[in-house]
Amino acid sequence: MEDKLKKAKIIFVVGGPGSGKGTQCEKIVQKYGYTHLSTGDLLRAEVSSGSSRGKMLSSIMEKGELVPLETVLDMLRDAMLAKVDSSNGFLIDGYPREVKQGEEFERKIAQPTLLLYVDAGPETMTQRLLKRGETSGRVDDNEETIKKRLETYYKATEPVISFYDKRGIVRKVNAEGSVDTVFSQVCTYLDSLK
C-alpha cells in the first residue's frame, strides 16, 4: 500500500484566501478524478467523529494551539491510503504551510509531483473575500481580518514556493481571471502529467 502512494500523482495546491483554489480543486476533481484532501476538512471531520483522536484534537483546537504535524500527517496518510486504489491522484489543499511540513510529508508519505500555485493579487483576494463575506456570514471575511490573513499567508508561503521552485516543480497559475480562464491554465499543467 505504502508503495502505491510513492507512485501516485500528488499535487500540493497553494493559494491565498480568496485566490479561488477551492473552486479550482473542485473542477480538477470533476475533470480528472483526483481526490481533494484539505487538512482543515480532515481535522473537522475527525473532531465531529468523536474518536479518541478527535477528542484530543478538539481540546488542542479549543485552546487555539496548533495541531502537531505528526497528527496531521497521520490523518493525511490514512485518507490517502483509503483512496489510493480508486483515485487518479491527490490534491493536497493548503499544505504545506511551511518548508518543514513539506519535508516531513516526503519523509512519511511521498514526494509531490507538482506544486500548483494559484496566484491572485492582494486586491483581488480582498475583493473576493469581502464579497463572500456578504453571503457566507463567515466572521473571518471582514477587511481587517482579511488583511491579517493575507500577511500571514504571504509570510508563510514564500519560503515554501521557493523551496519547491528550486526543484522545478512549481506551476504558477494566474488566478486573476474568470474561473474558466484560470482552469484552462490548470489543465495545461495537469495534462502534461499523463
Curated annotation (Swiss-Prot):
Presence of keyword Transcription: no
Any single GO CC term annotated in Swiss-Prot or TrEMBL for this entry: sperm flagellum
Name of the protein in question: Adenylate kinase isoenzyme 1
Gene3D superfamilies: P-loop containing nucleotide triphosphate hydrolases (3.40.50.300)
Intracellular or extracellular location(s): Cytoplasm
Domain notes per entry: Consists of three domains, a large central CORE domain and two small peripheral domains, NMPbind and LID, which undergo movements during catalysis. The LID domain closes over the site of phosphoryl transfer upon ATP binding. Assembling and dissambling the active center during each catalytic cycle provides an effective means to prevent ATP hydrolysis.
The protein's required cofactors: Mg(2+)
Ranges for region LID: 131-141
Known EC number: 2.7.4.3, 2.7.4.4, 2.7.4.6
Reaction it catalyzes: a ribonucleoside 5'-phosphate + ATP = a ribonucleoside 5'-diphosphate + ADP; AMP + ATP = 2 ADP; dAMP + ATP = dADP + ADP; dATP + AMP = dADP + ADP
Residues that bind ATP: G18, S19, G20, K21, G22, T23, R132, G177
